[in-house]
Amino acid sequence: MAKASIQFFRGVDEPVVPDIRLTRSRDGLTGQATFRFEQPAAIAPETMGDITGMWMVDEEGEMVTREINGKFVNGTASALEAVYSWKSVQDFERFMRFAQRYAEANGLGYSQNQNSDQTDGDANAEA
């Protein structure tokens, strides 16, 4: 079984784990996942080559997005942001299977905002 990984260069796993944010349409058919990588290995000075996409690879195969943007601070690359979009429930379910495998492979958790009216704050804070 192949370990779930993200690659900016085919065959080279990106070691930096991104922050991932999901948005979906009200009908649930379309949506996108935004990946933000802070100081990824793919933009290290010693890395050669152009980044032409982000591949999400697991035991089912691969998904790819070409929507990649670099973030720069004082003229130096500091982050990468990639957006993966889906246009069907099947595509979303496939993405979520990858996300679950990727989370397990990297010791990550998953949290979901159940109520858009929630306010930020610590629910366990003492008065």
UniProtKB/Swiss-Prot annotation:
Polar residues biased stretches: 109-118
Compartments where located: Cellular thylakoid membrane
The keyword Magnesium is assigned to this record: no
Chain segments annotated as coiled-coil in the UniProt record: none
InterPro entries on file: Psb28_c1_sf, PSII_Psb28_class-1
Swiss-Prot/TrEMBL keywords: Membrane, Photosynthesis, Photosystem II, Thylakoid
Residues covered by region (Disordered): 107-127
Cellular component aspect of the GO annotation: photosystem II oxygen evolving complex; plasma membrane-derived thylakoid membrane
GO biological process: photosynthesis
Keyword Thylakoid attached: yes
Membrane topology: Peripheral membrane protein
Annotated NCBIfam families: PS_II_psb28
PANTHER family (UniProt xref): PHOTOSYSTEM II REACTION CENTER PSB28 PROTEIN, CHLOROPLASTIC, PTHR34963
HAMAP family: PSII_Psb28
Family: Belongs to the Psb28 family.
Quaternary data: Part of the photosystem II complex.
Protein name as annotated: Photosystem II reaction center Psb28 protein
Biological source species: Parasynechococcus marenigrum (strain WH8102)
Gene field: psb28
